[in-house]
Amino acid sequence: MTTPTTRKDLMIVNMGPQHPSMHGVLRLIVTLDGEDVVDCEPILGYLHRGMEKIAENRTIIQYLPYVTRWDYLATMFTEAITINGPEQLGNIQVPKRASYIRVIMLELSRIASHLLWLGPFMADIGAQTPFFYIFRERELIYDLFEAATGMRMMHNYFRIGGVAADLPYGWIDKCLDFCDYFLTGIAEYQKLITRNPIFLERVEGVGIIGGDEALNWGLSGPMLRASGIEWDLRKVDHYESYDEFDWQVQWQREGDSLARYLVRIGEMTESIKIIQQALEGIPGGPYENLEIRRFDRLKDPEWNDFEYRFISKKPSPTFELSKQELYVRVEAPKGELGIFLIGDQSVFPWRWKIRPPGFINLQILPQLVKRMKLADIMTILGSIDIIMGEVDR
């Protein structure tokens, strides 16, 4: 009888691209020494659709329906960045009411994105129950979106100089009711998850990123704020009307998966505070800057003539992008979503470079999982929060 020999060689395992916990079509080639991870190589590109090249052959209004397919769980942010660039290039003023509506929609979208991060993240580490709970609240947000925009997911709601339609009658009261209800929902999650000993065993001290390391890797969003860096573009860049509301930047010092969870839970509470203040203080007035429909076509336009009042309000504006370059960014749920835009005195952008937060946050994954256990890969990957639509573009 021969004695079995122990294996000394390393094992290479494929995770994905159709693995249910991969959050899209991400493929990881993992090198294992028993249960220990020796190396991990992410393979991208399965969801590449040429979004940057498409942008260079479309006007801004034609391109708006495409951008909701980057991060398809937080579509308001991709729309916001797409119209913020041309607005800054053309120095277009946004009415106060439109700015408040945008803030409300952006924060609702942030909550919906964080909820759909929380459920699968908990399922990844073995807790099935929250996965079903989060859909309860998320459906209420989608009901609000549907009432205001007509669409549950790909909203196509933002426009250059405002939004596509005003809030319908009764929407503000319905949204305030949701805010009151959702605060009790967050308290329920805190009770169910935050002090759960099994949950803490799985996430505490797993995937630690220091502050300097986070800056060197170019991380942003909850990944950066969980590492002790108090950096939020809503406070830094003063875009939309965020300066008019009282809210706090959520951050933690530890830099592990638990800290990233706590930052996102805290952000949902702060988003509710912003929404409540915006709903209670929303001013009257127009929801769209109608003057930009003319886009400098006429030197002395007649504001009250028949064509302006009845014809030129709704057609797609042929907005010429002036010959300059610009970088605009917003604080998306996953981090800094930016666009580098080069105009060429044409209706099409000459260059449209997307800076997706998920793509840059994902770069640190191989370093985080080295010398960890195989089961910790799902915890760390889940805590990064990626959507392959924006990673591959």
Swiss-Prot record:
Keyword line: Chloroplast, Membrane, NAD, NADP, Plastid, Plastoquinone, Quinone, Thylakoid, Translocase, Transport
| Main subcellular location of this protein, as a coarse class | plastid
One GO cellular component assignment for this chain's record is: chloroplast thylakoid membrane
Q: Tell me which Gene Ontology terms the entry assigns under biological process.
A: photosynthesis, light reaction
Transmembrane helix as UniProt keyword? no
Q: What is its EC number?
A: 7.1.1.-
Q: What catalytic activity does the UniProt entry give for this protein?
A: a plastoquinone + NADH + (n+1) H(+)(in) = a plastoquinol + NAD(+) + n H(+)(out); a plastoquinone + NADPH + (n+1) H(+)(in) = a plastoquinol + NADP(+) + n H(+)(out)
Where does the protein end up? Plastid, Chloroplast thylakoid membrane
Q: Which GO terms describe its molecular function?
A: NAD binding; oxidoreductase activity, acting on NAD(P)H, quinone or similar compound as acceptor; quinone binding
Q: What topology in the membrane does the UniProt record assign?
A: Peripheral membrane protein
Family statement:
Belongs to the complex I 49 kDa subunit family.
Q: What does this protein do?
A: NDH shuttles electrons from NAD(P)H:plastoquinone, via FMN and iron-sulfur (Fe-S) centers, to quinones in the photosynthetic chain and possibly in a chloroplast respiratory chain. The immediate electron acceptor for the enzyme in this species is believed to be plastoquinone. Couples the redox reaction to proton translocation, and thus conserves the redox energy in a proton gradient.
Q: Which NCBIfam families match?
A: PRK06075.1, PRK07415.1
Question: How is the quaternary structure described?
Answer: NDH is composed of at least 16 different subunits, 5 of which are encoded in the nucleus.
Name this polypeptide is given:
NAD(P)H-quinone oxidoreductase subunit H, chloroplastic
Which species expresses this protein natively?
Atropa belladonna (Belladonna)
